[in-house]
């Protein structure tokens, strides 16, 4: 990932936000390290998701700890870095909207700049998420 970010950074003046998947590990330190490495490669933003390809969704507490560590890493940089925290419920087979909202609220509380809930199914779900948080929301239906 870092090699691709560095290549893009070399080729364009546009700001780069990297999809950092789950931070390339389950520990909060892994999420923090992914932020630092992406920033070193030239990214000014990145996303961390609450899903692991081997084990599925992280429990909420672990997911929040990981986003908090990523936010602390982003805040420790010497330039602004936009952290997007992803609640993967809806695209991973758990369409429980209340849990998605609670995760996004917790991610916001620990420092995520942007909240992302891919897979919301309709305008009513998108509105419910947007009404429940104050930070910018990204969504994909």
Model feature map: region roles:
Residues 1-139:
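Alpha/beta enzyme core
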